[in-house]
Amino acid sequence: MKKIFLMRHSIPEKGDMPNERIPLSEKGKALAVSKRNILSKVDRCFSSPYRRAIETAECIADHPVIVEELHERTIGDAREDFWLKQYEDYDFRNPGGESLNQVKVRMKTAIDSIVGQMEEGETALVVSHATAICAYLLSYCEIEVKDAVDKVRKISFHGKEILNGRFQPADGFELLFENDAFSDICIMN
């Protein structure tokens, strides 16, 4: 059995800068550090190349490996109703952006590669982004939008409710892999 903690980055700074360069806020750093106890026994750590994800990973583990494919979904030229539309049609994308299906394939390729690098019995932390993580989970889970304005989702796996609410900063999922195949998921506690 192999285990991955698939975690959303912590709370970012607010400001006007390129998405990939946004750092963690002081509150975000403190929240990430508070996750150390839960994640103290990880054998490996991987991160999106975005600064807020790297900083989250570095608050928890030493020397995270940067995996380009773990980056957030490219939004492109966003429209007002974009967030809901992407869940109504997984192939929907803004001009210049990625669809959830495109992100799902990219994320699944990255995580399958990470699982393939792990030894039996190892645990890894993977820090990424809310939409990228939810897109990956579409490979195995059902995702239902409960409230598009507040970005409330219900995520289920084989009829078992995993999350019913907002996917908060520094929250995540515990994924289990048997013979390198996805076998179970629960919320990260």
For the regions a language model picked out, list residue spans one by one.
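Generic beta-sheet signal
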Residues: 4, 120-130
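Short beta-strand scaffold positions
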Residues: 47-48, 105, 127-128
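Short active-site segment of divalent metal-dependent hydrolases/proteases
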Residues: 12, 132-133
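Active-site signature of alpha/beta-hydrolase-fold catalytic machinery across serine-
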Residues: 59, 135, 139
